[in-house]
């Protein structure tokens, strides 16, 4: 289309004024509320609805933060590297660091205090009685690849009663390395058999760094379990499978294809 100069000039001026008018309609205003976050909304809804039995956690699904459908995290890290003899791949580690890697206390002279916690979501135990045979079992270890807990350090398990008070039901004060072992407790006190039951693990140690480490795995709460809680029957990977590469855990495909025979490790060993 061949437009004369006056017409093209008028079109250009019209477009300029339209752009200025449109630009004038935009104003920067502060947010009046936080935009909804679908992920956070799902987590919050999981916290509102009580968990039902059986409660089962082997820490194999989530890495880093524990499963928000089951837990309220207070600093623990789900990993597979802080212990060399876990019952299966994945466990939660307690130490003196927050989840973001910062210490709870910046003063190295503070030798003991509460550090990481791991709290269950609300669990509905309403309608159960002391005769319902509710059992809780878990596997735990001390030190592993971290520092050995000191004399005043401990790992504590607490139950929340009907009045909302936390009652200590188990603790251990390991002064030496302890490989993973199991513990089984009866939940047969009527104070704990209510609709808003919770339990939590609390670590006490040096809160200024990666000290006084504990690990936790296979946390199970169930009624009349059809298995022996002290005998795990789980077809599971016990550690991270090693790389099929000879020299690396991973490498660019282009580099591998240059010499696959050289880069491939012995997959039979």
Can you say where each PLM-predicted feature lies in the sequence?
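Surface-exposed, low-complexity/disordered Ser/Thr/Gly/Pro/Asn-rich loops and linkers
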Residues: 75-130, 215
């Amino acid at each position: 289309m061949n437009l004369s100069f006056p017409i093209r000039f008028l079109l250009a001026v019209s477009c300029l004024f339209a752009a200025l008018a449109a630009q004038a309609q935009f104003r920067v205003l502060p947010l009046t509320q936080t935009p909804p976050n679908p992920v956070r909304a799902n987590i919050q809804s999981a916290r509102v609805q009580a968990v039902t039995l059986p409660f089962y956690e082997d820490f194999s699904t989530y890495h880093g933060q524990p499963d928000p459908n089951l837990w309220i995290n207070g600093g623990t890290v789900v990993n597979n590297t802080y212990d060399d003899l876990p019952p299966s791949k994945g466990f939660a580690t307690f130490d003196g660091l927050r989840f973001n890697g910062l210490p709870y206390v910046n003063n190295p002279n503070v030798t003991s205090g509460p550090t990481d916690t791991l709290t269950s979501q609300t669990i509905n135990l309403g309608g159960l009685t002391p005769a319902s045979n509710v059992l809780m079992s878990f596997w735990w270890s001390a030190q592993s690849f971290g520092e050995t807990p000191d004399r005043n350090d401990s790992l504590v398990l607490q139950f929340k009663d009907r009045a909302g008070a936390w009652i200590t039901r188990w603790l251990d004060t390991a002064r030496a390395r302890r490989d993973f072992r199991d513990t089984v407790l009866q939940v047969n006190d009527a104070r704990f058999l209510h609709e808003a039951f919770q339990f939590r693990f609390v670590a006490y140690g040096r809160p200024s760094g990666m000290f006084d480490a504990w690990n936790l795995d296979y946390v199970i709460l169930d009624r009349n379990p059809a298995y022996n809680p002290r005998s795990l029957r789980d077809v599971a990977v016990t550690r991270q499978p090693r790389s099929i590469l000879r020299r690396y855990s991973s490498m660019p495909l282009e580099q591998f294809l240059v010499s696959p025979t050289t880069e491939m490790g012995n997959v039979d060993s």
